[in-house]
């Protein structure tokens, strides 16, 4: 039994024992898909027996069970929370049958199903895999990539992948997969290879066996391997050896372990991306491949490899060469021509050329690979032994391009071959484990030999490769890593569970509830050689039975009967572990520090292995000790500690530290039983006997020592002082003091112990840990605990300087005398004093203090990874107060010295020339640098709050500096650190994908029915009510543009009208009104542009176009379908199209839309087809049509529906703007005969579709100056009419379309049309414009134009009426903004009456427009410039339309003159509109508004008929559109009034086209609900020319001069420019003042303008910067000179700019004039009344709940205050100070200083930390750097109230001086002369020494204290001690023996 207890002593107690049942198994039973049969299959056989009577059935069912049973499997992994950090819970992936269940735990609760998947066939394998989403496939991508986390489910023929974002992929598998592995890059597949693959008669290369897939949408590509050959050079080849199997794959480091079944060896490879040169080597053809090897040579090489001598590790790969893989062509029998995934009869077949993504499922693996596989294909043999004919000699087909391999495995290590190698030595389990010192081991378990082989490996110095070392064998039956505590659990052959760290044994694991194997398992345990077959379900069947093909089972059932008991208990819920003979059978599913044990009775238990330490203090100390000790010693220390800590009945968290101290001291050679302070440790319960393992076990009877211990205990003292004790008059027991004296005399250390030699090193690192803890205000308790240990060690090592340091830090804790353990000289020799050990204690406070004073200090020693705060503080002080910017960027830093075990250069050299303040950078630069650096190293506000307030002050100062004017492009972390939530939220939003934003409108559910279907309820009313807050203009616009309600038909019935005539009258009136109604959708589309995010599961709501009316007074319906009047056919078809476009344009570009949704919206009824056609066009304009599958596009076009074709062609072209996309070009060319070869079949393409296709070509080739396209389009402008009515109607629109398209293709290229000089483009266009003889048609289409039209007799002259508009606009677009005067002069209006007669007046509009667009920079926004475009002859003879009498003239045609006049004016106005589009330029606005008013007056003038009402209406419409362009998106009231007036005009002269123009103007005015404006880029001008072409349709079906669909191209010119400030605290839009700075141009200097946001910004290229102005909101500057991208991304996400209200300010809504904020100003200006403020008023300054609570509880006076009133006043003034200065974070610092002063006054300061902080604050404010800062920025910084600091300083000085005079001088003298000091004075003495920087006695001048006679001499003698003069003045009386203190 004693033997057992000793074993028990070094045991490790496992905790938290729970029965384990995979969660998925339970869930399966209740899963709706789990049908009865599957349920039965999962039940044990015995249950079936009882439920079913027939025994025969049971037999068959049991047979099923054995197959099905093994299909159950599961795996666990560490939980990954959404944010990405690892959380401490399990995730389980469970597979059974065709179901996969993924369940997740969480920190608080048990597992719950996360997702469950059911697939069609049996799941072979399921796994987690992260795919990388990236275009660039370079290696560096894997460092900072976007991951797509997926679950992959392998079935026999395909692989399903489901991402957590909800994306599903399915990849067909071209072969049978034996195994799939998740890698760092994607998936790795192993192909099934049957063992009896017969080599074909023809010698040919073997097939690859391993493949990779980098993304579910990528192809499966073969894996390449690279291995050193026998001759030293490495060779690259495919992995083809079927004997090589993967046994393990690890993600980080990315390595693969393989097993060669022939050689019986394991190899390790690194998995990486293929390099380009390796790709080339593998893909080379045999002729080029240098050495041509055929299959025979390659196999002989492998044979040679396999016969390598046993001793050496084969460097060459066990893989065959595969360089000749291309030599044979595709087998004729392979049907894989049309498959996406390749056939691998050879690599030529691995071709991308024939892989459309269809037809994947139809081929079995055998067919695809021409090899035998597990699927028993009837063709099997014929495929395996293909006759030679099938491999015909044709070489690589020209179009087949081989599949390029993606991944490569690079050989790292192969195990050496022993003398005899067992056949079956494949590793059954492989894992990587790290030992407690960070050394890594690759462990693989060879079950057959009961061996765990551990290979040590490490990274090379340059981190590029792994170096493998020696192999250690551990006897084991099973093993599993315990990651969290860097150990592994090993199940030994005898059933013991043992913990190892690396290859060092830690101890046995004791599992409560399971009997120890040594007791129970003497007979039960099978011999190690017997494989444990039938136990535990999850062992794969193949392992037990071998391949089913080969082994013929006589009867599997009896075998199973044997194990049915196990299966029973497996499902038995309440199984007990105490059954006799239960032993651990295997270990599985390790996660974190939990692991599952499979027991021999089939049940499973999950245990937790205890952690190395739970308290932070012990963890840190262990880390430091581990860091400094040699690895082998460190391992021993950690193992000993772990045994002590984790013994059964181990310590609580409370006593963990005590246990650690005793354990550590024991290992150092102390006898802790005799050391007074460790002896008094109170352990809860008895100590584990492990602590002092050398002692014999104490007898149970007790001893004298126990009694002594009790008398010395705290318990005894409590009993003694108890009342009962006194009342009974018991005499006090004599406590024997002999022991104590005994203690103090002859204590010594045992120098033979493990850590004796390392005591100084351990002491030093623990001291550094102590200094680190001082920088964390939460670790006060830890400091007290650690100081005891440090003081003991410092005493014994005779380190007085350290003792003095600890005394000054904690005077109450450090006794000046204490128990010393003597270390004699001889022993001292054994001690190793490391080079980094300094005689002066490193002190972080002292270091910072010296730094602030500008004194020299040695570099501060720090432990990398442990003392991170010390490093941070040192570097931030060096950066901010010394101005050394390089300190944070350099790896080696002069301010820090890394503590390492390797020797360093002596410290003395490094001490010279230190710490000079550099003036290199400005303060703001230093502050920014500091803040950005701190955020980059992960420092957060929470860390800042735990720094002591004095240390934190410089950092807070820097933060305060940055907060005023931060950079707009700082990261989220930096913005959070400086307390700018507005910026951090902006940065955070910037990283999110564009989607539904803060401002997405939420329609209230209670909207009225009438509003529901007008198509305008998705606008953001909250923002619009801010933009237009004074009136209801938005409702007005909505009323004007709605087309879903019937119109009012007001007709008066005159007496002479019969009822029938009256009805006709009403219907005629309705027909007139319908002209207007049909024009409304175009305007509505503009108004609601991009305002809606559709729900992908719902169809898009399209408001109906209502063409009925209501006649008052009885609201009777008036309808056009009554047949009373003639209604034009198809009248509403284009109106429906426009309605569809308007509905589609509501969809915002960032919406989640896919092809399925687009098709889903297709209407059921044919009459809605036009609407859908418009919807398709709209989707193209907002960029969504690219998602429509090619198949669907083809489908729509073959229907032959004209409108659908128009919408689709224009839509896809707009979506592919300027891309020259070939597939779209092909699509368009079919519809443009001129682009087809002359011999092609003539297709019957409707005219309008041709027009759309031509414009489409222009869009796709926009700005490319593509020669062929330009040539064809140039010819098409003047295309003559052909025979048989071909191209005879509506020629104008086609010619115009060709002109516009040509203009787009050569947009803005001007005279730089490279390679087109022979086309004479400008001359040809000029000819089209003015007329002349038609040129001879060149090129391939000349045949077409030989036969003339029989209908139209034009002869060989150009018909200018047809070609002029297109040619004019083409010239305008080609020479747009080029200021080319010679071309512009061609376009000048004629200046003689004769020439005027030759030009149609409306063409003058186009010419004027074109000329002005070319001379872009000459356009000026005034009427003088407009008039300057009118030729002199017209100006001189222009008539006033208001005159009654018209002048008579024989020479002049007044009609021509006046028409020419109005059209030229209109053209100039239109060009003005283009020039200032979206600018809201006031001069342009007033100029255009004047002309609009003039035209309105002309219409009612007496002589209007001379000009003609139609012409005047056209010109008015053009001017109105120009006006709307300039004011786009602004909702200007004057323009709205004009539009509203014209909306009401519905007389006979107002046709459909004019209504269209007026409502387009209205739409532009409110573009996108005020969120969008127009751009003036070349592309935008081109789009606007198409959309606003100044010839309007006469009626709703008129497309003669201009295709109506083009009216919507304005979308391409719209850009989001609305900036909406959103208050970051309330998350609501608000007003904010912004200032934009315009760059200087030739017209104006750089200017600034203030705008009140929400507002439309000017075009970004005009701006230099934009800033949010104070004083209400924190300032924010966006500098556009650095790039416009940041602001563009803000504007594209609804323009949300987060702003933060400053303290004491109210928003513009609450306080428009800013008067209420004055209250805050008085406080901020530090008036004397500030103190008198009431705490209640604070709520108007700040909304911070913490500050409000502080005011509530600490600043409100109560009735009887008394002395507390003073504190209350102080707190109130501090609070106001903080709020008004906007530094609420300083409140705790103020209060801490106040508390420190109070405790100093009371003289009960237990430690000097707070005094240090006050000292550091005073030093910071008097430091040179701060003084300079104050000088440069008098208004910034000034953190602490200037009145508060002097008060603090005076209070501290006065208190210490009082103490000095009241007897303190005696203590100081005693201290300095090394004599004992009175105990009661120790606290104040320490405060005095710290505050006045008094040096330690040993630093005083050697002559001692006496000897100086004068103060001057004293100053001289103390000069090297850097003592402040004020301190010397106070010391002088003590030192000079003068009783009069010289206090200043």
Curated annotation (Swiss-Prot):
Positions bearing Phosphotyrosine: 571
Q: Which residue positions does Phosphothreonine occur at?
A: 291, 537
- Keywords recorded for this protein, A-Z: Cell cycle, Cell division, Mitosis, Phosphoprotein, Repeat, Ubl conjugation pathway
Which GO biological-process labels does this protein carry? anaphase-promoting complex-dependent catabolic process; cell division; protein branched polyubiquitination; protein K11-linked ubiquitination; protein K48-linked ubiquitination
Q: Which residues carry this modification: Phosphoserine?
A: 51, 60, 313, 341, 343, 355, 362, 373, 377, 547, 555, 680, 686, 688
Name the segments for region: Disordered.
312-343, 370-395, 991-1014
Q: How does it assemble?
A: The mammalian APC/C is composed at least of 14 distinct subunits ANAPC1, ANAPC2, CDC27/APC3, ANAPC4, ANAPC5, CDC16/APC6, ANAPC7, CDC23/APC8, ANAPC10, ANAPC11, CDC26/APC12, ANAPC13, ANAPC15 and ANAPC16 that assemble into a complex of at least 19 chains with a combined molecular mass of around 1.2 MDa; APC/C interacts with FZR1 and FBXO5.
Functional description taken from the UniProt entry: Component of the anaphase promoting complex/cyclosome (APC/C), a cell cycle-regulated E3 ubiquitin ligase that controls progression through mitosis and the G1 phase of the cell cycle. The APC/C complex acts by mediating ubiquitination and subsequent degradation of target proteins: it mainly mediates the formation of 'Lys-11'-linked polyubiquitin chains and, to a lower extent, the formation of 'Lys-48'- and 'Lys-63'-linked polyubiquitin chains. The APC/C complex catalyzes assembly of branched 'Lys-11'-/'Lys-48'-linked branched ubiquitin chains on target proteins.
Protein name (Swiss-Prot/TrEMBL): Anaphase-promoting complex subunit 1
Question: Which organism is this entry from?
Answer: Mus musculus (Mouse)
Organism lineage = Eukaryota, Metazoa, Chordata, Craniata, Vertebrata
């Amino acid at each position: 039994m004693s033997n057992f207890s000793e074993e028990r002593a070094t045991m490790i107690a496992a905790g938290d024992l729970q029965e384990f049942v995979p969660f998925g198994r339970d869930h399966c039973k209740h899963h709706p898909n789990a049908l009865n049969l599957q349920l039965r299959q999962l039940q044990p056989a015995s249950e079936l027996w009882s439920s079913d009577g027939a025994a025969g059935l049971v037999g068959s069912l049991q047979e099923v069970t054995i197959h099905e049973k093994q299909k159950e499997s599961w795996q666990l992994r560490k939980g990954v929370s959404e944010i990405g950090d690892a959380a401490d819970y399990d995730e389980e992936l469970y597979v059974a049958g065709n179901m996969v269940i993924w369940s997740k735990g969480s920190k608080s609760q048990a597992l719950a199903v996360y997702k469950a998947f059911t697939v069609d066939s049996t799941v072979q394998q399921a796994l987690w895999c992260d795919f990388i989403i990236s275009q660039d496939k370079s290696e560096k991508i894997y460092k900072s990539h976007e991951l797509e986390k997926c679950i992959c489910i392998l079935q026999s023929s395909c692989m399903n992948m489901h991402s957590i974002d909800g994306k599903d992929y399915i990849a067909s598998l071209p072969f049978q997969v034996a195994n799939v592995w998740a890698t760092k890059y994607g998936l790795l597949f192993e192909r099934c290879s049957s063992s009896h693959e017969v080599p074909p008669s023809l010698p040919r290369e073997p097939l690859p066996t391993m493949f990779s897939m980098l993304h579910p949408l990528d192809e499966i590509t073969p894996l390449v391997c690279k291995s050193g050959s026998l001759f030293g050079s490495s060779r690259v080849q495919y992995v083809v050896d079927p004997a090589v199997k993967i046994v393990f794959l690890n993600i980080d480091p990315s390595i693969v372990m393989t097993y060669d079944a022939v050689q019986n060896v394991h190899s390790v490879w690194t998995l990486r991306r293929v390099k380009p040169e390796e790709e080339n080597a593998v893909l080379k053809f045999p002729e080029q491949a240098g050495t041509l090897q055929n299959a025979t040579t390659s196999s002989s090489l492998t044979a040679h490899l396999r016969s390598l001598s046993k001793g050496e590790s084969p460097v060459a790969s066990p893989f065959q060469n595969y360089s000749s893989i291309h030599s044979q062509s595709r087998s004729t029998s392979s049907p894989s021509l049309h498959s996406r995934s390749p056939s691998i009869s050879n690599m030529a077949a691995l071709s991308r050329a024939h892989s459309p993504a269809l037809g994947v499922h139809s081929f079995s693996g055998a067919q695809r690979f021409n090899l035998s596989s597990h699927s028993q294909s009837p063709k099997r043999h014929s495929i395996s032994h293909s006759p030679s004919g099938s491999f015909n000699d044709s070489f690589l087909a020209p179009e087949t391009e081989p599949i390029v391999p993606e991944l490569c495995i690079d050989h790292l290590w192969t195990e050496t071959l022993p003398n005899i190698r067992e056949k079956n030595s494949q590793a059954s389990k492989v894992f990587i484990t790290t030992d407690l010192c960070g050394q890594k081991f690759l462990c693989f378990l060879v079950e057959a030999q009961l061996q765990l082989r551990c290979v040590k490996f490490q990274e090379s110095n340059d981190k590029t490769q792994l170096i493998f070392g020696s192999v250690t064998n551990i006897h084991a039956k099973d093993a599993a890593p315990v990651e969290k505590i860097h150990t592994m659990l090993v199940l030994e052959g005898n059933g013991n569970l043992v913990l190892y760290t690396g290859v060092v044994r830690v101890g046995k694991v004791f599992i409560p509830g399971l009997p120890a194997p040594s007791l129970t398992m003497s007979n039960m345990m099978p011999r190690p050689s017997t494989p444990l077959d039938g136990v535990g379900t999850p062992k794969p069947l193949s392992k037990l039975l071998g391949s089913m093909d080969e082994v013929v089972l006589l009867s599997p059932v009896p075998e199973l009967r044997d194990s049915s008991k196990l299966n029973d208990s497996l499902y038995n819920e309440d199984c007990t572990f105490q059954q006799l003979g239960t032993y651990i059978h295997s270990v599985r599913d390790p996660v974190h520090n939990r692991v599952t044990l499979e027991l021999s009775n089939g049940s499973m238990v999950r245990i937790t292995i205890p952690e190395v330490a739970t308290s932070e203090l012990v963890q840190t100390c262990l880390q430091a000790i581990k860091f400094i000790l040699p690895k082998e010693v460190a391992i021993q220390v950690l193992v000993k500690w772990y045994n002590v800590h984790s013994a059964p009945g181990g310590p609580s968290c409370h006593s963990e530290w005590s246990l650690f101290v005793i354990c550590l001291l024991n290992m150092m050679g102390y006898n802790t039983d005799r050391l007074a302070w460790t002896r008094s440790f109170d352990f809860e319960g008895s100590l584990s006997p492990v602590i002092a393992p050398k002692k014999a076990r104490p007898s149970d009877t007790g001893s004298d020592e126990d009694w002594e211990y009790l008398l010395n205990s705290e318990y005894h003292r409590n009993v003694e002082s108890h009342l009962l004790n006194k009342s009974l008059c018991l005499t006090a027991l004599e406590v024997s003091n002999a022991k104590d004296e005994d203690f103090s005399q002859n204590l010594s250390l045992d120098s033979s112990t493990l850590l004796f030699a390392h005591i100084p090193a351990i002491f030093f690192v623990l001291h550094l840990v102590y200094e680190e803890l001082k920088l964390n205000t939460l670790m006060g308790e830890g400091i007290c605990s650690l100081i005891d240990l440090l003081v003991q060690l410092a005493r014994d090592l005779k380190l007085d300087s350290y003792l003095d340091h600890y005394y000054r830090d904690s005077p109450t804790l450090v006794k000046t005398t204490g128990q010393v353990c003597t270390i004699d000289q001889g022993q001292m020799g054994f001690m190793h004093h490391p080079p980094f050990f300094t005689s002066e204690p490193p002190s972080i406070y002292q270091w910072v203090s010296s730094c602030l004073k500008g004194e020299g200090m040695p570099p501060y020693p720090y432990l990398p990874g442990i003392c991170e705060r010390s490093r941070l503080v040192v570097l931030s002080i060096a950066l901010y107060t010394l101005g050394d910017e390089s300190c944070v960027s350099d790896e080696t830093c002069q301010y820090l010295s890394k503590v390492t075990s390797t020797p360093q250069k002596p410290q003395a050299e490094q001490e010279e020339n230190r710490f000079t303040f550099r003036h290199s950078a400005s303060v703001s630069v230093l502050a920014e640098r500091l803040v950005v650096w701190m955020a980059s190293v992960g420092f957060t506000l929470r860390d800042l709050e735990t720094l002591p307030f004095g240390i934190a002050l410089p950092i807070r100062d820097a933060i305060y500096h940055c907060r005023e004017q931060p950079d707009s492009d700082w990261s989220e972390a930096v913005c959070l650190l400086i307390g700018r939530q507005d910026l951090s939220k902006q940065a955070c939003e910037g990283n999110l994908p564009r989607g539904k934003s803060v401002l997405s409108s939420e329609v209230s559910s209670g909207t009225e029915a009438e509003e529901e279907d007008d198509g305008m309820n998705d606008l953001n009313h909250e923002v619009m009510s801010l933009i237009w807050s004074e009136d209801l203009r938005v409702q007005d616009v909505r009323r004007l543009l709605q087309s879903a309600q019937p119109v009012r038909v007001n007709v008066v019935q005159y007496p002479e009208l019969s009822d029938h005539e009256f009805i006709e009258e009403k219907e005629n009136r309705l027909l007139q009104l319908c002209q207007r109604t049909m024009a409304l959708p175009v305007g509505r589309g503009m108004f609601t542009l991009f305002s809606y995010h559709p729900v992908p599961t719902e169809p898009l709501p399209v408001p109906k176009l209502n063409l009925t009316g209501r006649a008052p007074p009885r609201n009777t319906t008036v309808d056009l379908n009554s047949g009373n009047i003639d209604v034009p056919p198809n009248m509403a078809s284009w109106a429906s199209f426009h309605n569809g476009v308007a509905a589609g344009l509501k969809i915002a570009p960032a919406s989640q839309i896919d092809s399925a949704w687009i098709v889903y919206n297709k209407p059921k009824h044919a009459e809605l087809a036009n609407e859908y056609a418009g919807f398709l066009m709209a989707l193209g304009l907002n960029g969504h049509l690219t998602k429509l599958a090619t198949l669907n596009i083809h489908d729509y076009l073959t229907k032959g529906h004209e409108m659908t074709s128009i919408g689709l062609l224009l839509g896809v072209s707009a979506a592919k703007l300027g891309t020259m996309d070939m597939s779209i070009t092909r699509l368009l060319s079919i519809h443009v005969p001129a682009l087809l070869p002359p011999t092609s079949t003539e297709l019957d393409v409707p005219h309008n579709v041709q027009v759309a296709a031509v414009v489409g070509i222009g869009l796709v080739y926009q700005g490319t100056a593509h020669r062929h396209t330009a040539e064809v389009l140039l010819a098409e402008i003047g295309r003559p009419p052909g025979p048989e009515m071909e191209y005879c109607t509506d020629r104008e629109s086609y010619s115009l379309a060709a002109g516009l398209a040509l203009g787009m293709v050569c947009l803005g290229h001007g005279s730089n049309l490279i390679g087109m000089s022979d086309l004479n483009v400008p001359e040809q266009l000029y000819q089209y414009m003015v007329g002349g003889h038609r040129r001879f048609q060149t090129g391939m289409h000349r045949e077409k134009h030989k036969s003339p039209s029989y209908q139209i007799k034009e002869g060989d002259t150009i018909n200018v009426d047809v070609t002029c508009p297109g040619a004019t606009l083409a010239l305008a677009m080609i020479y747009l903004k080029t200021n080319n005067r010679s071309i512009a002069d061609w376009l000048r209006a004629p200046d003689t009456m004769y020439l005027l007669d030759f030009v149609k007046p409306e063409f003058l509009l186009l010419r004027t427009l074109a000329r002005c667009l070319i001379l872009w920079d000459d356009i000026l926004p005034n009427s003088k410039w407009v008039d300057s475009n009118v030729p002199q002859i017209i100006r001189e003879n222009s008539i006033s339309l208001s005159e009654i009498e018209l002048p008579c003239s024989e020479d002049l045609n007044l009609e021509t003159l006046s028409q020419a006049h109005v059209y030229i004016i209109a053209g100039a106005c239109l060009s003005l509109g283009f020039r200032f589009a979206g600018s809201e330029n006031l001069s342009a606005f007033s100029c255009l508004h004047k002309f609009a008013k003039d035209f309105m007056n002309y219409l009612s003038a007496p002589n209007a008929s001379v000009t003609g009402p139609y012409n005047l209406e056209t010109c008015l419409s053009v001017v109105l559109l120009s006006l709307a362009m300039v004011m786009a998106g602004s909702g200007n009231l004057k323009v709205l009034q004009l539009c509203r007036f014209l909306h009401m005009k519905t007389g006979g002269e107002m046709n459909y086209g004019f209504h269209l123009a007026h409502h387009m103007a209205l739409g532009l005015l409110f573009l996108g609900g005020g969120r969008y404006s127009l751009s003036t880029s070349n592309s935008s001008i081109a789009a606007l020319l198409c959309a606003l072409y100044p010839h309007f349709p006469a009626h709703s079906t008129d497309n003669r001069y201009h295709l109506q669909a083009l009216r919507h191209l304005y979308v391409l010119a719209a850009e989001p420019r609305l900036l909406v400030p959103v208050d970051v605290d309330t998350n609501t839009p608000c007003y904010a003042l912004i200032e934009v700075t315009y760059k200087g141009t030739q017209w104006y200097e750089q200017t600034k303008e203030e705008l009140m946001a929400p507002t439309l910004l000017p075009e970004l290229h005009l701006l230099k910067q934009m800033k949010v102005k104070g004083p209400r909101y924190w300032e924010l500057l966006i500098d556009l000179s650095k790039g416009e991208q940041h602001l563009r991304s803000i504007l594209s996400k609804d323009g949300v700019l987060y702003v933060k209200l400053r303290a004491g300010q109210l928003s513009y809504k609450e306080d428009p004039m800013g008067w209420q904020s004055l209250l805050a100003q008085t406080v901020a200006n530090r008036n004397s009344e500030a103190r008198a403020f009431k705490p209640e008023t604070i709520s108007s300054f700040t909304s911070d709940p913490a500050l409000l609570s502080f005011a509530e509880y600490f600043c409100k006076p109560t009735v009887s205050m008394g002395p507390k009133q003073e504190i209350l006043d102080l707190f109130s003034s501090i609070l106001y100070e903080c709020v008004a200065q906007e530094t609420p974070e300083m409140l705790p610092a103020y209060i801490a200083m106040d508390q420190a002063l109070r405790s100093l006054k009371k003289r009960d300061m237990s430690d000097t930390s707070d005094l240090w902080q006050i000292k550091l604050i005073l030093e910071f404010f008097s430091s040179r750097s701060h003084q300079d800062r104050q000088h440069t920025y008098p208004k910034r910084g000034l953190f602490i109230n200037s009145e508060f600091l002097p008060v603090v300083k005076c209070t501290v000085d006065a208190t210490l001086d009082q103490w000095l005079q009241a007897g303190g001088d005696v203590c100081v003298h005693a201290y300095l002369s090394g004599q004992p000091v009175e105990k009661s004075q120790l606290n104040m003495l320490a405060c005095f020494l710290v505050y006045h920087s008094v040096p330690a006695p040993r630093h005083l001048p050697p002559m001692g204290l006496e000897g100086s006679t004068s103060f001057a001499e004293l100053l001289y003698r103390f000069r090297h001690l850097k003592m402040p003069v004020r301190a010397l003045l106070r010391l002088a009386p003590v030192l000079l023996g003068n009783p009069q203190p010289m206090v200043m």
